[in-house]
């Protein structure tokens, strides 16, 4: 059986690599003062937006005809309990502020893939409600096939 990324039954045989993708003629929802931009191109390099505008070209890009399609920024889920291994609740104490979700992020949870498919790119993972003061949260940027350490935001403030 081949190694997969993540190494579970629904992983990819080949580790996914970032690509340069050019979306042509999309309706772009900026969620900013610019509003909705019709027939607009979006160039994505190394997983980040590199350019937004008209008539963008890049010889190295895979071109996607996005006419009639809508693009928006990734959704941020500010209250999630997915991808947590046996650590959602620490019910034995009134306060579990000494523990952190960062220690129990499960990068192999299929719900990461489902979140990404639904447009959720970033989540705050929280403890459950078993005690008055829960443990510290973790903020993650979902990347299917990446390790937990690769998904955790670096130098984040640990919130309760």
Question: What spans do the regions from the language model cover?
Answer:
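Histidine-rich, glycine-flanked metal-binding segment
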Residues: 34-72
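Envelope-exposed proteins and targeting segments
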Residues: 19, 24, 38-40, 121, ...
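Divalent-metal coordination cores built from histidine and acidic residues
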Residues: 66-160
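Solvent-exposed loop/turn tips at the surfaces of repeat/solenoid architectures
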Residues: 25-26, 47
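Extracellular/periplasmic ectodomains of large secreted or surface enzymes and adhesion receptors
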Residues: 1-25, 53-56, 67, 80
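Short beta-turn/strand-loop junction motif enriched in small, turn-promoting residues
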Residues: 28-33, 125-128
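Short loop/turn motifs at secondary-structure junctions and domain boundaries
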Residues: 11-13, 31-35
């Amino acid at each position: 059986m081949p190694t997969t990324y993540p190494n579970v039954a629904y992983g990819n045989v080949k580790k996914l690599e970032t690509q340069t993708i050019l979306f042509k003629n999309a309706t772009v929802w900026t969620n900013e003062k610019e509003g909705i931009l019709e027939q607009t191109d979006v160039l994505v390099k190394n997983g980040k937006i590199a350019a937004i505008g008209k008539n963008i070209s890049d010889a190295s890009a895979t071109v996607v005809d996005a006419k009639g399609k809508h693009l928006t920024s990734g959704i941020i889920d500010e209250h999630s309990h997915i991808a947590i291994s046996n650590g959602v609740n620490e019910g034995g104490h009134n306060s579990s502020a000494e523990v952190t979700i960062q220690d129990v992020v499960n990068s192999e949870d299929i719900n990461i893939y489902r979140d990404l498919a639904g447009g959720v790119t970033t989540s705050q993972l929280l403890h459950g409600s078993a005690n008055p003061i829960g443990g510290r949260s973790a903020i993650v940027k979902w990347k299917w096939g990446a390790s937990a350490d690769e998904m955790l935001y670096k130098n984040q403030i640990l919130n309760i």
